[in-house]
Amino acid sequence: MNVRPEQIPYRDFYRILLSSVAPRPIAWVSTLNKGHLNLAPFSFFNAVSAKPPMLGFSPSLRLVDGQSAPKDTLHNIRETREFVVNVVTFAVADAMNLTSGDYDSSVDEFALAKLTTRPSQLVRPPQVAESPVSFECKLNRIIDFGTEPPSGSLVIGEIVCVHLEDNVLKEGRLDPDSLDLIGRMSGTQYSRTTNRFDLKRPEVQPPETPHSRK
């Protein structure tokens, strides 16, 4: 079976995309604009560079009164050029889900989900105190893919500071068991990172050169 995006309804291809690109890590993004706190999860998310350290996530456009409009997260980042990406653990899954609603921009999702703010060091938006790892980011660039919903934009931010809770560190490294991260599947399904296995990378010898044979 071969499928071309233009040959089937958008929703059908969307289901194929989200069911096969999974599990996806979740960026729980906190922003601040004109005194209003905003917090929302995005599963089109990943690390995109190690040096300089960059994270990227993709919020989609939405319809407001019949007009195309950016989500509050994207609007706030365009205005302030700062945001925080908080990781999502199993313990806060319900709170994360509660913040995913399409609320009015005046709604404080921290208060709605009964979450605690933790001051950031180098950016204005606060962190989610219940999240054990929070990345403070400065906007690097935004790439827009369209002007009509559900087109998205790729937001890339440079990490300027990262907060790590001591209770998820073991011998100076992040411990996956203590982190207990979750990932997004399709529909209402999520996955938990408790069933893991190890694979060692293959050892590949460099090819011989005339210089190395001497």
Model region roles, listed by residue range:
Residues M1-K214:
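Basic, polyanion-binding surface patches
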